[in-house]
């Protein structure tokens, strides 16, 4: 069963793996650093799916993301403005990253996030440290 696409306030990026394109949904309040984290991942070879607003839908117990047509391939670079970047039109979302500026547990219990009855792993992360991108990459690779 396929649920209708729904926009969600989040940024999404994807990395090519031997299993195909695998995506990460980066969530958090405005100004927390979602786009900044995405830009750092893009600098490591990832592709943008969508910035700020992401179409998210479930099909066969799998989550997928794409960009609204009006913002496809565009991302905000704070202090520079809206820039264009290569993008991945669609990808399977494997991991949710909840961005926060609050303290993050060093060894947290496993957490999940559910959208439209599909549950995926969830990582709580402060996006500001330089290592944040590598933490996301490591978490995705472990799935």
Predicted regions and their residues:
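Short, acidic/polar N-cap/turn motifs at the starts of alpha helices
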Residues: 10-12, 53, 110
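Conserved nucleotide-sensing/catalytic segment adjacent to the nucleotide-binding pocket
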Residues: 16-22, 43, 47-101
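Glycine-rich phosphate-binding P-loop
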Residues: 18-42
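Conserved NTP phosphate-binding and transfer environment spanning the P-loop NTPase/kinase superfamily
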Residues: 89-143
